[in-house]
């Protein structure tokens, strides 16, 4: 109607304190505007002079009111002089900086992200199934910051773990710093206009008092999703709040799938109220408001390319190369938003979910930002070397402190394009960061070269030259540990979970034996991280630590 951007109107509203203006002040402003119009009128009539006199007297009377409202100035106009950022105010932005942020945001987003932006103005619930690495977390972090600055609404970021939720915070802090040189501080981040940005993991079950716009990241990888969604949606139950769910697909068996498919809406409702939602890519590629009140969209990597992410000086994706690097199954799951049928997996998602914990809450002895994150406690390293066309996987595991205790995956790494010398150098760097007492390495192929170099600085490294028997022993040990609830890793590490899910039972070429395999690619989550983890777990005997297979030596 006015031809102005929403961000400009929000800036006027905030600068002139429209929400703080009382009815009597609005009357004074209207009278002033009418008085100005009459004064500048060239040919005045008698009634114009009468109205000028009346308006002048009325404005004088309003000025004589008790000075309990400082919004009207001596001239009768509303206070609203342009405010500048106060140097002593934490996390403060001037109006000019907010406008610059808005411009930087709109100039940086792609067409498919612009679709999310438009949907955010009119849809209460956005539900997006997406390809990996298309900038969803990056986009929603920026969107939320601007919404908080423009409207004063709280923003709640919920992820499988607090570490994952803090990825939002990193994007927000970086955006403010790069665009307008404002350094945001605090956790949560509190803005001068009262808006608060919360970053939560699964401990949000105890945070029901929070309220604001909800952003739920990678919800298809969160354990006990239905339980958590009830709490999370309650934070945004007021009509002014919006809810945004976005994730890469996991398993058809995950309890978030009915929420995506619309089957959850039908539960407990009479049959005549049931809805049938078309969740095919053809139906949802452009975004669609569905019968259950959700706005859904599927964005594949090919949609992202069509949406402009390859239009810059540095294209994000080379689809031809990706089709070579990934198997058809991997390409469909990672990039075309197709769900995994893990019914044939040795490690289905339902078995892995109890292992996924919010490490920032439950591990108080691990400090990932320290030079020595685990102090002088011992760790084991498992390594799956890079073969032609795939990535190298490495995990650092804290072994149990007592027999039958829990293994904790402290860190996991993915290294691309490194030769065997560079891979060995990465392992050596870890031995300086941790007190390493065991290293297990696959010595098949290039792994032999890595192993030879590792033994120069860690002579006790254990080799695994793959055979049917060795693979079977590794998988059996991992199954035993996982099914007994003895493995923990960060709930935000869906790449590690997917890596285990990719391992399946198969038949050897001779048809005489059963073995295990996982597709290999440059994506760490498909096989290599799981095998690396199993190399470390194998340091404990299959039957566990017992009196007959453990001992100690005391030196006098």
Language-model regions, residue ranges each:
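ASCE P-loop NTPase helicase motor core
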Residues: 176-185, 189-192, 223-318, 431-432, ...
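C-terminal nuclease/phosphodiesterase catalytic domains that cleave nucleic-acid phosphodiester bonds
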Residues: 64-80, 226, 346, 395, ...
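Pre-P-loop entry segment of helicase/translocase ATPase cores
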Residues: 11-14, 19-125, 196
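Conserved Walker A/P-loop ATP-binding site and its immediately adjacent core
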Residues: 152-172
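Nucleic-acid-processing active sites and adjacent nucleic-acid-binding tracks
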Residues: 191, 299, 364-365, 369-372, ...
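ATPase catalytic-site recognition across NTP-hydrolyzing enzymes
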Residues: 288-383
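Inter-Walker segment of RecA-like/P-loop motor cores
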Residues: 166-212
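Walker A/P-loop
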Residues: 123-143
């Amino acid at each position: 109607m006015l031809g102005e951007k929403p961000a400009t109107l929000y800036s006027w509203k905030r600068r002139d304190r429209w929400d703080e203006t009382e009815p009597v002040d609005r009357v004074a402003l209207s009278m002033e505007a009418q008085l100005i119009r009459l004064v500048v009128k060239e040919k005045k009539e008698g009634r114009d002079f009468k109205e000028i006199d009346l308006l002048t007297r009325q404005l004088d009377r309003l000025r004589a009111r008790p000075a309990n409202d400082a919004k009207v100035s001596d001239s009768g106009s509303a206070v609203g002089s342009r405010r500048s950022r106060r140097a002593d105010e934490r996390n403060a932005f001037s109006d000019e900086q907010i406008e610059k942020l808005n411009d930087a945001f709109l100039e940086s987003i792609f067409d498919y992200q612009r679709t999310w932006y438009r949907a955010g103005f009119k849809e209460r619930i956005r539900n997006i199934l997406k390809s990996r690495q298309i900038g969803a977390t990056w986009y929603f972090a920026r969107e939320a910051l601007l919404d908080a600055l423009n409207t004063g609404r709280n923003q709640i970021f919920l992820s499988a773990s607090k570490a994952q939720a803090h990825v939002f915070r990193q994007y927000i802090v970086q955006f403010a710093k790069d665009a307008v040189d404002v350094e945001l501080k605090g956790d949560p981040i509190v803005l001068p206009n009262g808006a608060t940005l919360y970053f939560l993991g699964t401990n949000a079950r105890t945070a029901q008092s929070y309220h604001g716009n909800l952003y739920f990241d990678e919800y298809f990888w969160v354990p006990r999703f239905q339980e958590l969604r009830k709490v999370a949606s309650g934070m945004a139950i007021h009509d002014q709040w919006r809810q945004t769910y976005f994730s890469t697909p996991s398993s058809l068996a995950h309890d978030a799938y009915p929420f995506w498919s619309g089957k959850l809406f039908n539960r407990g409702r009479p049959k005549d109220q049931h809805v049938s939602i078309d969740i095919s890519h053809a139906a949802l590629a452009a975004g669609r408001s569905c019968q259950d009140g959700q706005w859904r969209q599927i964005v594949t990597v090919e949609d992202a390319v069509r949406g402009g992410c390859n239009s810059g000086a540095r294209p994000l994706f080379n689809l031809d190369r990706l089709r070579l690097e990934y198997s058809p199954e991997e390409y469909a799951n990672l990039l075309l938003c197709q769900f995994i049928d893990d019914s044939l997996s040795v490690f289905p998602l339902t078995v892995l979910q109890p292992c996924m914990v919010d490490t920032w809450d439950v591990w108080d002895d691990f400090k990932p930002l320290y030079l020595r994150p685990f102090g002088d406690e011992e760790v084991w390293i498992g390594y799956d070397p890079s073969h032609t066309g795939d990535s190298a996987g490495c995990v650092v595991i804290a072994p149990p402190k007592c027999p039958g205790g829990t293994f904790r995956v402290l860190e996991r790494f993915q290294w691309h394009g490194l030769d065997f010398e560079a891979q060995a150098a990465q392992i050596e760097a870890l031995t300086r960061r941790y007190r390493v007492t065991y290293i297990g390495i696959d010595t098949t192929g290039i792994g032999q070269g890595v192993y030879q170099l590792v033994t120069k600085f860690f002579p006790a490294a254990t080799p695994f030259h793959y055979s049917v028997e060795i693979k079977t022993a590794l998988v059996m040990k991992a199954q035993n540990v996982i099914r007994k609830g003895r493995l923990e890793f960060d709930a935000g590490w869906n790449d590690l979970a997917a890596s285990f899910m990719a391992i399946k039972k198969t038949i050897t070429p001779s048809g005489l034996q059963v073995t295990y395999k996982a597709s290999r690619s440059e994506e760490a989550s498909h096989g290599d991280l799981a095998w690396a983890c199993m190399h470390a777990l194998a340091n404990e005997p299959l039957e566990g630590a017992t009196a007959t297979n453990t001992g100690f030596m005391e030196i006098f």
